[in-house]
Curated annotation (Swiss-Prot):
NCBIfam families associated with the record: plsX
Family to which the UniProt record says this protein belongs: Belongs to the PlsX family.
Catalytic activity from the UniProt record: a fatty acyl-[ACP] + phosphate = an acyl phosphate + holo-[ACP]
Oligomer and partners: Homodimer. Probably interacts with PlsY.
A GO cellular component entry from the record: cytoplasm
A GO biological-process term: phospholipid biosynthetic process
Pfam families: FA_synthesis
HAMAP family in UniProt: PlsX
The protein's name: Phosphate acyltransferase
Source species: Clostridium beijerinckii (strain ATCC 51743 / NCIMB 8052) (Clostridium acetobutylicum)
Name of the gene: plsX
Gene3D superfamilies: Isopropylmalate Dehydrogenase
UniProt keyword terms in alphabetical order: Cytoplasm, Lipid biosynthesis, Lipid metabolism, Phospholipid biosynthesis, Phospholipid metabolism, Transferase
Subcellular location: Cytoplasm
Amino acid sequence: MKIAIDGMGGDNAPVAVIDGAIQALKAYDDIQLYITGPEEVLNIELAKYTYPKEKVIVVDAKEVISPNEHPVMALRKKKNSSIVKALNLVKEGICDAVVSGGSTGAFLAGCTLIIGRIKGIERPALAPIMPGRRGKFMIVDVGANVDCKPSFLVQFAKMGKIYYQKVFNVKNPTIGLINIGEEEEKGNELTKAAFKLLKEESSINFKGNIEPREIPTGDTNILVSDGFVGNTALKMYEGSASSILGIIKDEVLKSSIISKIGVVLLKPVLKNIMKKFDYKEYGGAPFLGVDGICIKAHGSSDARAFKNSIKQTKIFYDNNVLKDIRNEFSSEN
């Protein structure tokens, strides 16, 4: 498997990107990495590691697109940027997948404009895997489409179903619509219309509306929403998990000696909880609906997070998710 890596994508690039890439090479002997970015900068970082030289190809890209640039304008202006070069490697069939921790707007726009959508897909959607109390779940969409039509959400559900089935080996995953109440008539015009369409779609296991307080349970495998609601839910979830863990740490520091001894005994449990809610464990989020394997890593990813983003890419590839989504929507046209 050949993977294009945006070597300059992310707050900690290129150091964390290269470190994570080398970790991935050690973990998976069937991958080859094409890393894009300024050749001299990448080679300096690569020189710090021992690795099979034939497994890494540096693709020179002198420009970098920053998060504060207008996505589409930057893509058109900076043809020699690390993101554009990485995306073109997939478009040209040189690589099987692409990973970037760079500008979310530029990456998602580039995936759509350069690689293109799968035939029949109205809008691609960003779909991260999240930790829940009783299992992992995914939210589709978390920011690629702020404004949606009801039909978009049905496609999000169908793409999410295919991904979840293949990756987690769940035959008929449950699907819910994020809304302000469980009743069918609750919500705005979008959610009311989407509810009706989702309920009528016989190919999915639709549970109904899911209130935000139910999201962390993980009882529902796939949650669909427009990108505005999904992104808000995602960031609130991440922030809440971080805050709760922070409160626990603060209380431990203020507690008595006996309480601290108890915490020491619970340390393995607390460590497992912290690991479960660490985004670095889950790597990047797949951009479902584009005609290629595109994984968006968190902008603040460290080496472990980049390594796990490459792992997500390999899982997507090994399970033929792209082929199955293509087949699903080609049969509808």
